[in-house]
């Protein structure tokens, strides 16, 4: 069950066991605090552009966020000094992320800005293949396993995983699964 205060600044959610989670919002309806039934909480703050500026998680770890001029996150920095960074291409697609431990993940795209590969920090690569209608038709993971998809129009009609298992999907006249 959900209950909202008259001003809209706070909402409570009660689960089937009667546990209450309280959500608090600022004047722009952004979540500023979440209080959980176990007594832990999260807090969030925002910069003047409206982006998430800082977050205190349930374990007490504080993270601050830095953005570029286009509103994309370029850095997450924890209170212990560990950072996670992000780089983007001119089309706005992420090209690299560096995790808190320094591991780098690279992302490549084709001329239509479709993701074609992800290379993880250990060098494992996942590749993505599309058809002429820009539909994802295959994903090959770092272990060489390929999952393939077939379509009827925009609807996936089958998916076959790397072990050869196939799932078939049917839709009604309104394209509902």
What are the functions of these language-model segments?
Residues 1-177:
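Extended charged/polar low-complexity repeat regions
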């Amino acid at each position: 069950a959900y209950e909202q205060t008259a001003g809209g600044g706070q909402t409570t959610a009660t689960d089937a066991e009667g546990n209450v989670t309280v959500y608090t919002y600022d004047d722009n309806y952004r979540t500023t605090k979440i209080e959980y039934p176990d007594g832990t909480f999260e807090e969030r703050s925002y910069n003047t552009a409206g982006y998430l500026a800082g977050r205190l998680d349930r374990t007490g770890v504080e993270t601050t966020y830095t953005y570029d001029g286009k509103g994309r996150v370029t850095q997450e920095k924890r209170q212990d000094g560990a950072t996670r960074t992000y780089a983007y291409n001119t089309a706005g697609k992420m090209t690299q992320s560096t995790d808190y431990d320094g591991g780098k993940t690279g992302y490549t795209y084709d001329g239509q800005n479709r993701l074609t590969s992800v290379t993880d920090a250990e060098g494992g690569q996942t590749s993505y293949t599309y058809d002429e209608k820009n539909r994802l038709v295959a994903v090959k993971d770092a272990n060489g396993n390929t999952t393939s998809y077939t379509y009827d129009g925009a609807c996936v009609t089958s998916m076959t995983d790397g072990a050869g298992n196939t799932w078939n999907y049917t839709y009604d006249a309104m394209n509902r699964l």
